[in-house]
Amino acid sequence: MNVVQVPTIVRNLAIQFHRSMICAFAFISIWSTGAFAQTSHPHNASPQAQTDDQKNNQSALIKIVRDSTERFQDVAEAVREGYTLQFGCVSGPDQGAMGLHFVNSDLVSRGIIDPTRPQIVIYEPTGDGHLKLIGVDFLLIASVWDADKTHTGPPQLMGQLFHFWESPNRFGLPAFYTLHIWAWKENPNGAFVNWHPNVSCQSFGGN
């Protein structure tokens, strides 16, 4: 498997950070919405008991994500398809980390939920300077989603309710809906929570 070292990625993509985010969000209102999705509470909740149907749906969704993103185990392929590094390495004070987010600004601007086309692919920096694919993130700008009258409520994907993230936020984005899926690294707190307790940004050499 081909890999791209972290310092190389940072040098190649740092300039694109502000440009891509400005292009993707220039037309979007920064005002918060009154949506009733799950809030972005900083701590992970304990996994809840699930029915067999829920478990089957979750397994099916994870499989779709894995099948659709397997090629991105080589981060160079993600870059070729329009994903660029944003936000540095996202970590939390006491709940682990989210890792490195490679964002496809075109997919974000479209605002479409497609399990085979995540807006973000997530990597963890490793001790040897490489990147390991660990999951994906589906991200929708809240004001755009809520303005569409065909939507009867907050976004869901195969039964998984998106989390609502208010503005202002650490990412400098308008309020948004997000759904992390830890398809490539098992999360003891569940496959669809925001934070991964076993992900670390310690090996990240960028800013």
Regions found by a protein language model. Give the residues of each.
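Bacterial N-terminal signal peptides
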Residues: S20-W31
